[in-house]
A protein has these predicted regions:
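Conserved helix-turn-beta segment immediately C-terminal to the redox Cys motif
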Residues: 26-27, 36, 40-63, 84-87
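Short, thiol/selenol-centered motifs that function as redox-active sites or metal-ligating centers
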Residues: 23, 34-46, 65-68, 72-73, ...
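Thiol-/selenol-based redox modules, centered on thioredoxin-like
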Residues: 106-159
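N-terminal "domain-start" segment that seeds a small globular fold
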Residues: 1-21, 41
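Short, internal strand/loop/helix patches
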Residues: 77-124
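Thiol-based oxidoreductase modules, predominantly thioredoxin-like and allied folds used
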Residues: 57-74, 90-101
Length: 159
């Protein structure tokens, strides 16, 4: 198993390689997302959080996922258009990925190894905070709003 989150890579929503080493010395909030979920309005809070903290070193990384009630059925191009037009999302998005089970992206398997069961997404908009050195800091459940005090306090401490 890899030593840090920086040992993993995703693919951007546009199909380019996205090694997490690109975020060395940044704090990263990794969030599995969906466009047709009751929690989809969290995109707004995620974008505000990103806007508030990006100059201090925070990256929000959206991971579209269709594993929860099929609530992210679109293509990567459709997801990107939805996020940009409905929520003015400016933070990076990856191509669709699985976040739990045998087919889970290796990053999520690593996070579970680091943080235990709290790192396993139970629904859309589950959040995992990664520190500047690639360490797994904390996981937050889907109903925890992006700008909730427990998330902003953890981000402040990590920055």
């Amino acid at each position: 198993m890899a030593a840090s989150a920086h040992d993993y890579a995703f693919q951007t929503i546009d199909g380019a390689a996205l090694p997490l080493t690109a975020f060395k010395d940044k704090v990263v909030l990794v969030v599995n997302t969906a466009s047709a979920c009751g929690l989809t309005p969290q995109y707004d809070g995620l974008e505000k959080l990103y806007s508030d903290y990006k100059d201090r070193g925070l990256v929000v990384l959206g991971i579209p996922c269709n594993q929860f009630a099929g609530q992210e059925p679109g293509t990567d191009a459709e997801i990107k258009a939805f996020c940009e037009t409905r929520f003015n999302v400016d933070f990076p998005l990856t191509s669709k990925a699985e976040v739990k089970g045998e087919g889970a992206h290796p990053f999520y398997k690593w996070a579970q190894g680091q943080l235990g069961e709290p790192a396993v997404p139970v629904w859309n908009f589950h959040k995992i905070l990664i520190g500047r050195h690639g360490e797994a800091i904390q996981a937050f459940g889907p109903r925890t709003e992006p700008r909730a005090p427990e998330i902003t306090a953890a981000i402040e401490a990590a920055l």
